[in-house]
Structures are given as C-alpha cells and as structure tokens.
Swiss-Prot record:
Superkingdom classification of source: Bacteria
Subcellular location field: Cytoplasm
Organism the protein comes from: Aliarcobacter butzleri (strain RM4018)
Assigned keywords, A-Z: Cytoplasm, Methylation, Protein biosynthesis
Protein's name according to its UniProt entry: Peptide chain release factor 2
HAMAP family per UniProt: Rel_fac_2 (MF_00094)
Protein function: Peptide chain release factor 2 directs the termination of translation in response to the peptide chain termination codons UGA and UAA.
A molecular-function term among this protein's GO annotations: translation release factor activity, codon specific
Nucleus as UniProt keyword: no
C-alpha cells in the first residue's frame, strides 16, 4: 500500500463512519440511556419484573452499539491525526506502521457498519426458516437438503441452536420440505438475507448421462415473534388438516394423526409441523410459524409500498443467488453483485461474509 492508496482508504472509512453516525444517531441513544437510568432509579422499577427485564435488554443493546461506535470513532480519529502528523513530518516509519494496520482498521469499521445494519427491532430475533424444493423431483429435493445442511453448519459455526419443526424426506434423496428455528442473537438479522430463490447449476449425480442440470429451491425466513406482538388469526380464515407424521422412506413415526398443516386462506400461506409426537405441541408450533409468516408478510407489504412497488403474491419471491459448480465454480449474489470462488466452504456454512456483503449493499442502495 502506498501513500495515495492509504489516503483514499481513509477518505472511504471516514465517509462510512459518518454514514454510520447518521443511521445510529448516538446522541439519541445516549439520551435514551439517561431515561433508562432514571427509570432504574425509581423505587417501583423492579415491581414489574417483566418490564424491568425488557428494559435491561434494551439497555445492554444500546451500550453494545455505542461502545462499538465509540471504539471505531476513537480509532479512526486517532489514525487521522497520526497520519496527518506523519505526513507533515515525513515520518516514514510511522507511515509504514499505519499501512500495516490498515486492514485491522478497515475490519473494525466494517464490523461497526454491520452492527448498525442489524439495528431493526426484529433483527435480534430468532429466525424461522423454511426450505422448499422447486420443480425437478429428486434433483431439486437434493439441492434443498444441501441448503439445509449449509444453514445447519452456519448455525453451528456461530454457536446458534437449531430446533427442527418439520422435516419431510424426499422419495429417493434430499427433502420435500423442512422448517426449523435458528436461535441466537441477530439470527433473523442475518438470515433475512437468505429470503428468496437459490439456483444451483451442476452435473447431476442422478443423471446417468452426466448432463448439467439447473435446480431451484425457495428459502423463506421470518422472525420468531414474541407475545408482545398481537397477530389476530380468525378461525374463518384458516383450515387445519391433520395427518400421520412420517419419517424417511415413508416410515411412520407414530400411528396417530399428530402432524398439523394450517392454511391461511386469505394469503395462501401454508405451514406444517410434524416433529413432535404430540398433536397439541405440533399445533402450537404451526401457529407460531403462521404468526411469524403473517408478520413477515405484512412487513414485506409495507416495504413494497414504501419503495413504490407492488408486492408479489408469488410465494417463491425472487432469485437472489446462483451456485454454479459446472462448468466453473462460483457463487454469485444478485444483490451485492459479488462473486465468490470458495464454493465448497460456502456450502459447508461459511456464508457470513456473503450475508454481510448483502446487508451492506442493500442498506447502501
């Protein structure tokens, strides 16, 4: 790195930090912290334990954001001053040190940028994820199972917990349908970037002629909502079906109709759960999924209205990413317009950078 490149990098990082400050609004957050301190000083604050806990969580999140921003601000301010002095005094040793530390500074600003991108109220929620293979039988069902494994590995890498809600194995290979919850801080904030159609191009292992096949799978992600958000579901708007839960190869898990499928008639949203032997528990989980899907549905309508576009009724959404294994290897995301060559690592769950690039690109746009 030379003096010109470093100077341009500093300009970019200062611009990024100013944008972060504009989005984060530290003054407003500090004002809210003062309000919380006053509330905590009240004698009857702990009489309402639920509210006190909620405020405590809010306080910790605000402190986390401010600490991260202040660290980045202090670091960049100090670097600006040091660079100005070193340049004026032609201190090559100090300049060389700054060049060497450029990557660390860049990563610090990017980390701060990401934390701001995940500042929406729902971002900290758990993520309810459903994967549905497209047309194409075994080939698409196998692709759905590859995506499922990719997300399980990503959750494992981030020390997130996974709760399986529904799993329907494919007839020959792969899966017909899977729904699960990824539990952890900002799980939804990250996983919302996976909402959409995922396209795979490869030489099919199920084709004796070894021809190249294109497969599609839909990934639907919604935040797990708590009881504070009231989603009204009227009986007349839903149809509930029960059926026997089955395992891989059509093996019955039990002989009672414990599996639940709920159809929300006005929107066409369908959820199902068969993971538990108890029909009652499956029904509770299915309603949880439905409420989250309806909440996400309304959010999407609001976003579409704000952007001046009509919300698509197509549950398949839009193609967001292509995974090409043949004739070359590349994963390319259409939103960030960035291609990645580490295909094997990505399919093994190394998707955090790819998601962060999407978050930055979509927020910048």
């Amino acid at each position: 790195m030379d003096a010109y490149e470093y100077s341009e990098l500093l300009k970019l990082l200062n611009t990024k930090l100013n944008n972060i400050k504009g989005i984060l609004k530290p003054d407003i957050l500090n004002k809210r912290l003062e309000e919380i301190k006053n509330e905590e000083a009240s004698q009857d604050f702990w009489n309402d334990v639920e509210n006190a806990t909620k405020i405590g969580i809010e306080k910790n999140r605000i402190l986390g954001k401010l600490n991260k921003f202040n660290k980045a601000f202090d670091s960049l301010t100090g670097t600006n001053e040091l660079y100005e002095m070193a340049t004026a005094e032609k201190d090559d040793e100090t300049l060389e040190m700054l060049y060497e530390e450029a990557s660390d500074l860049e990563n610090l600003i990017k980390s701060t940028e990401i934390s701001v991108m995940l500042s929406n109220p729902d971002d900290s929620s758990n993520a309810i994820v459903s994967i549905h293979p497209g047309a194409g039988g075994t080939e698409s069902q196998d692709w759905a199972s590859i995506l499922y494994r990719m997300y399980l590995r990503w959750a494992e890498r981030n020390d997130f917990k996974v709760e399986l809600l529904d799993y329907q194995a494919g007839d020959e290979a792969g899966i017909k349908d899977v729904s699960f919850i990824i539990k952890g801080e900002n799980a939804y904030g990250y996983m919302k970037a996976e909402n959409g159609i995922h396209r795979l191009v490869r030489i099919s292992p199920f084709d004796s002629n070894a021809k190249r096949h294109t497969s599609f799978s839909s990934v639907m992600v919604s935040p797990e909502i708590d009881d504070n958000i009231n989603i009204v579901i009227e009986d007349k708007d839903i149809r509930i079906d029960t059926y026997r839960a089955s395992g891989a190869g059509g093996q019955h898990v039990n002989k009672t109709e414990s599996a639940i499928r709920i159809t929300h008639i006005p929107t066409g949203i369908v959820v199902q759960c068969q993971n538990d032997r108890s029909q009652h528990k499956n029904k509770d989980s299915a309603f949880k999924m439905l409420k989250s899907r309806l909440y996400e549905y309304e959010l999407e309508k609001q976003r579409a209205s704000k952007d001046g576009i009509e919300k698509s009724d197509n549950g398949w959404g839009h193609q967001i990413r292509s995974y090409v294994l043949q004739p070359y290897q590349q994963v390319k995301d259409s939103r960030s317009n960035i291609g990645y060559s580490n295909v094997d690592a990505i399919l093994d769950g190394d998707i955090t950078k790819m998601i962060e690039d999407v978050l930055i690109a979509t927020n910048t746009n």
